[in-house]
Amino acid sequence: MVANAKKDELSLTPMLNAYPDSLGGTLSDIADLLESSCKDAFGAFYILPSVFNTDLDRGFSVVDYSLNELLATPQDLERIRALGIRLKLDFILNHASVLSPQFQDLLKNGEMSKYKDFFIDWNAFWAGCGEMMPGGYIQPTPEYLHKMFFRKPGLPILRVRMPDGTEKPYWNTFCLLYTSPSPRDPKTS
């Protein structure tokens, strides 16, 4: 019985890896499956990050770490745990959404944000390793870029308008669309 494996034997048991909505629609549906046709088949369940409140990329752009109530409830997690299945949750701390409270604080407070170091300043990261372009970002030299994998075409830069009106490039692998706040149009104020 996999679910009754000793703690030191757990690494030898099968682990289910799934998005909470990938097997039926919700984590509750997965719990139903684990209680019935897959009973005792898994010793652990690695739940991919769309279990949290996210806005892009199947959960890899976290707004906050509350459970996404459309997909999961604390009761769903408890049902799975009660089966003797260890839960592994992917917190992906390095994938904050532009809607996250931390990024919103950066937009509001700029360099004074207590979260400014949560985000990678593109130019600070590449300082001394490329050329400043007219667009205000450093273009890394080919010797660095050819060793890297980028998920999407182009450089993963998000230009962010700071409170003082300047724009700053940040490294952003997932969201390439962001609308900087702009001054109110006098016609709509």
Specify the residue positions occupied by each region the protein language model found.
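Acidic/aromatic-lined carbohydrate-recognition and catalytic surfaces
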Residues: 2-180, 184
